[in-house]
């Protein structure tokens, strides 16, 4: 479903979608229904937003940490304050782009932005804080997997779960 908007994001997305289409339908000769295609492209968009979210979160964290360390506002808790600020602002970033490009409102659908934003924060808090902490404990303490590998394994569970929570709960349209 190509868009006819001329903004840079739409142009980049059309290129990505053409590459996906070529690989899946031409090279692998997969038969994909329109509904499957829409869900797949939505998941890829969600992944792109998530990748940008990770970069934004890290940059905000580092900047906040440097500001706190330079001004010695909260010396022993500086990294926690920086993490909270990074979480709040990066989820807001994700909300904006997910609302604009990934989980767009259907025709004649209604969606409360405030409720959607609160649900977005809750889903990211659940997967990003609660679930990842439990899974990390399981991988590291119970299964003795490296602390460096555990977060990567977490992504295999938390990203699809977060996608489902956002698609069917946070960004669900009222008809």
Task: Identify what each model region corresponds to.
Residues 98, 128, 137-140, 153-171:
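A structural feature that tracks compact, well-ordered secondary-structure segments
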Residues 93-103:
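Membrane-water interface of transmembrane alpha-helices
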Residues 48-53, 119-128:
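Select subsegments of transmembrane alpha-helices in polytopic membrane proteins
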Residues 1-40, 174-175:
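Transit-peptide-like, low-complexity N-terminal presequences
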Residues 33, 37-41, 74-89, 145-154:
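Membrane-interface starts of transmembrane alpha-helices
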Residues 105-124:
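Juxtamembrane helix-capping/reentrant segments at transmembrane boundaries
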